[in-house]
């Protein structure tokens, strides 16, 4: 397929990005993708410390347990992404995104109050399942909100913003854990998804 590109060569990349951030739906979804990636990666750095100190796990098993928990969340996220087509036949995409973000926020609180490692892992996997809906649906909604000939620049900017979330999540969660304790990371991540 070939498209006739209608982008003015004199128009700067920054002005193109600004023009799309004026669209409320695009701005909201780009922010959501940033916060989603921020929340997904934010728990990673504190998870071993949380399991070791608050759940009193033996040092030799902490890395294995954390690996299993992260794998479970990733696996369930992939399963959710695969099943989006069937779910969008029954529910609207905005409703799925809204439900998924609230479910993830609730599940982060449940992860914090779980007294056992396996309960934490189960709730993390379920949170991963709901996270698997957010990114593909948000990207689809963004693509519907912008003209075809300008999607490349928009998705380039969206990818950059999502990567910033991946980088800032661990940095800020480490700072929050240092200042307020590991529990504050779970609560602040939940708050991000409730926003």
Regions found by a protein language model. Give the residues of each.
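A membrane-interface helix-boundary motif in multi-pass transporters
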Residues: 175-193
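Intracellular juxtamembrane helix-capping segments at the cytosolic ends
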Residues: 133-146
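Pair of pore-lining "gating" transmembrane helices in MFS-fold secondary transporters
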Residues: 23-43, 125
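Short amphipathic helix-loop junctions that connect adjacent transmembrane helices
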Residues: 46-64
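Helix-to-loop junctions at the C-terminal end of transmembrane segments
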Residues: 79-92, 177
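Interfacial helix-cap and linker-helix signal at transmembrane-aqueous boundaries
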Residues: 51-52, 87-88, 175-181
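Juxtamembrane intracellular "pre-TM" segments in multi-pass secondary transporters
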Residues: 2-30
């Amino acid at each position: 397929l070939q498209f006739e590109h209608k982008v003015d060569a004199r128009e700067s990349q920054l002005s193109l990005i600004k023009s799309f951030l004026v669209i409320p739906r695009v701005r909201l979804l780009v922010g959501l993708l940033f916060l989603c990636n921020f929340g997904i990666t934010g728990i990673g750095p504190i998870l071993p410390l949380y399991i070791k100190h608050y759940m009193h796990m033996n040092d030799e098993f902490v890395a294995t347990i954390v690996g299993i928990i992260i794998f479970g969340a990733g696996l369930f996220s992939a399963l959710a992404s695969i099943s989006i087509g069937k779910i969008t036949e029954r529910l609207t995409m905005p409703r799925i995104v809204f439900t998924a973000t609230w479910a993830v926020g609730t599940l982060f609180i449940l992860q914090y109050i779980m007294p056992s490692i396996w309960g934490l892992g189960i709730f993390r996997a379920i949170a991963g399942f709901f996270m698997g809906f957010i990114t593909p649906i948000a990207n689809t909604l963004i693509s519907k909100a912008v003209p075809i000939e300008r999607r490349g620049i928009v998705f380039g900017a969206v990818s950059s913003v999502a990567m910033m979330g991946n980088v800032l999540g661990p940095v800020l969660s480490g700072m929050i854990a240092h200042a307020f304790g590991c529990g504050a990371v779970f609560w602040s991540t939940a708050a991000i998804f409730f926003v």
